[in-house]
């Protein structure tokens, strides 16, 4: 009796956990009314490029019908070698994907301790050891970044990026403007903590805005707050600086980056660091070994969600990385509980999207740098061109799931043959062929490529 009662309580508890997690994942502000009614979906390119001293920031038009439907906006940052994207934060949570390049990324979260310390004369990295040694620098945790990394960013958590490589670093950022953590409105905002407005003419979109947070304060207030003189306070305001938010560093920069997990052992227990402060905030999604679907002939797909990167529960977004070889195909499918923002990172593909009325709303060839929005429930297929196809998809749910129209795990495999016969007006042999012919689950080859 006790075992039965315990089992029932366990089932009820699990049901409540799943219900509340699902409800929490859906707590997004409603996008614009009727935003997802399309007669045609368009592929999107950047609407504006703001050039800085050592790079540029391109933004997509957040008022486009496609992005309004998804409730997101998109930016692309290009950093020249030895340049810094200066500290800034966004009003909504975001996911960033490193398209190319390598370097160092820092997050600045209020309440988190300075767990990285450099000590004068020390041969190692990090803090600890001899009390007679003098600290040269302390700062919050840093992360190395490289191609294929996905970074999660919470609302209001500042970040900076440094390109230490020999070529440009390119980072695509998707901001969830309808996330409940964004308490302002659905217009994207970037709050700069350093940097200044450039000399370029006024841009049509409202962001990136320009001056940093210090520039609006009375210099005397800044001087008192930091215990510095007025001249230094004016330096913080960047009053005579027009380099913008991406600047060139004066020589290679030095950082304290300890061995993995070392910084976690020296933290001060403050109740905050045990959540975001010590959370893993990035994962490389390009590694073939972590593929969820793999075909030696067609390609591979990797998924990053809150099950393998728990911080995504706070961001409420996830990512999917896909590669198709020449002639490879992603079987027709739909995302049941999220919109999809697909960014093309390489190659070409024919993409077709079908809406809730069974009408084709997109049927075009897409290439590098383009964005396509696939609304929740809309069916989509992808077929790679001769050079193959690469993409990164961002989905507006931290645990989004996909249903396929054909293949081993598709809805048709779960439907009895007699129901298929009645639904489509086919005989039993044709119904079985429809149900069982496709042996793949997600990735396949087109007939012309298979021959």
Curated annotation (Swiss-Prot):
List the Pfam families: Cupin_1 (PF00190)
User: Which cysteines does the record link by disulfide bonds?
Assistant: 36-69, 112-277
State its location(s).
Answer: Protein storage vacuole
Tell me which species this is from: Arabidopsis thaliana
Picking any one GO biological process from the record gives: seed maturation
Record function comment: Seed storage protein.
Q: Which family does it belong to?
A: Belongs to the 11S seed storage protein (globulins) family.
Q: Which gene encodes it?
A: CRD
Q: Which tissues carry this protein? A: Accumulates in seeds 8 days after anthesis.
Assembly and interaction partners:
Hexamer; each subunit is composed of an acidic and a basic chain derived from a single precursor and linked by a disulfide bond.
Q: Which GO molecular function entries does the Swiss-Prot or TrEMBL record give?
A: nutrient reservoir activity
Q: What is this protein called?
A: 12S seed storage protein CRD
Q: Which residues carry this modification: Phosphoserine?
A: 39, 302, 437
Modification type Phosphothreonine: residues: 115, 396
- PANTHER family hit by this protein: 12S SEED STORAGE PROTEIN CRD, OS03G0336100 PROTEIN-RELATED
**Posttranslational modification, per the record?**
Ubiquitinated. Proteolytically processed during seed maturation at a conserved Asn-Gly peptide bond by an asparaginyl endopeptidase to produce two mature polypeptides referred to as alpha and beta subunits that are joined together by a disulfide bond.
Q: Where is the signal peptide?
A: 1-25
Instruction: State the superkingdom.
Output: Eukaryota
Q: Is Cytoplasm included in the keywords of this UniProt record?
A: no
